[in-house]
A protein has these predicted regions:
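Conserved MFS/SLC helix-loop-helix module at the cytosolic interface between two early adjacent transmembrane helices
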Residues: 69-107
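Extracytoplasmic gate region of multi-pass secondary transporters
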Residues: 38-39, 217-259, 263
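Small-residue (Gly/Pro/Ala) motifs that create kinks and tight helix-helix packing interfaces
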Residues: 42-43, 74, 153-166, 241, ...
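Residue-level signature of mid-helix packing/kink "hotspots" within the transmembrane helices
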Residues: 36, 64-72, 154-155, 262-270
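Juxtamembrane intracellular "pre-TM" segments in multi-pass secondary transporters
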Residues: 2-14, 195-222
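Helix-loop-helix hairpin linking two adjacent transmembrane segments in secondary transporters
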Residues: 106, 137-138, 145-195
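Extracytoplasmic
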Residues: 19-53, 71-74, 236-241
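Cytoplasmic helix-loop-helix junction between adjacent transmembrane helices
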Residues: 113-148
Length: 277
């Protein structure tokens, strides 16, 4: 049975542990589809809306801007609302954002992208902390599980976005909107944790913590490394399908190639398991 940190909220029985893990995995699977579903449809969106490459570049960059801003402000939200409630709010933001960008307006395409990007940013920041707090003795296993689920979510979204968009019942807006079903389901699965996971009692001063980080050489090195890694990842996520299509491959094939590149990330579960031994 997985053991939880005694200083964290007590998960208790196996069913409650299983529900918490399920909630974590459902949050994880929602942190990539809203992003991965766009890349294969860039050409379709361009043809439908008349947006230029620079405007489409802005569309794919908005979530990254949200990540940078929200990541720094997340401690303020967890201090006020607690980690579980903040994650619940993040899932609602993802859902609202996905639905908003499916409205037949160019402006809502950008507004919805920003909203979903903010929600994803909260999830990116809080999931590792949540796992470390509640499963300190099994954090490697849980981390590998949710990391693999994230890769599966990205691969699935990248692969089926074009087939959905080519279906007259969906279109490209419907292909983007369909992921709101998954994020809304995750919200209801996670909701019980809002009452079960207690807020941490001790908090460091936000400004003092930021000053300490700003003066840390190690923090800057890690930030630069992770920033470059994320830059490469999201460029691939957003533009590889369009590049392949410009080389003569059809949209469906390009989407599945992106899906393959993301799906290989699920093998990290096996890698982490061996490393853990």
């Amino acid at each position: 049975m997985l053991e939880t940190d005694s200083k964290a909220s007590k998960v208790g029985s196996k069913p409650k542990q299983a529900l918490l893990i399920a909630g974590i995995l459902f949050i994880a699977v929602n942190l990539r589809p809203a992003l991965a579903s766009v890349g294969p449809l860039v050409s379709t969106i361009r043809e439908s809306t008349g947006l230029s490459n620079s405007m489409l570049g802005l569309l794919t960059a908005l979530p990254l801007l949200a990540f940078g801003v929200v990541s720094m402000l997340t401690p303020l939200f967890t201090k006020r609302f607690g980690m579980a409630a903040t994650l619940a709010g993040a899932l609602l933001l993802i859902t609202i954002g996905i639905l908003t960008r499916s409205i037949d307006l160019v402006s809502t395409l950008y507004i919805g992208t920003i909203l979903s990007g903010i929600g994803i940013a909260f999830g990116n920041v809080l999931l590792p902390s949540l796992v470390k707090r509640n499963f300190s003795s099994n954090s490697g296993l849980i981390t590998s599980l949710y990391s693999s689920i994230m890769a599966v979510g990205a691969a699935t979204a990248a692969g089926i976005s074009v087939p959905l968009a080519q279906n007259e019942a969906f279109g490209w807006r419907g292909a983007l909107a369909v992921w709101a079903i998954l994020s809304l389901a995750a919200f209801f699965i996670w909701l019980p944790q809002v009452w079960r996971i207690k807020k941490a009692k001790k908090h460091r001063n936000f400004m003092k913590a930021m000053k300490n980080l700003a003066s840390s050489k190690l923090a800057w090195k890690v930030a630069i490394f992770m920033g470059l890694q994320s830059f490469a990842f999201y460029v691939i996520l957003a533009w590889v399908p369009d590049i392949l299509q410009s080389r003569g491959y059809n949209a469906s094939y390009s989407g599945w190639m992106l899906s393959l590149s993301q799906g290989t990330g699920s093998f990290r579960l096996v890698t982490y398991s061996f490393v853990g031994r």
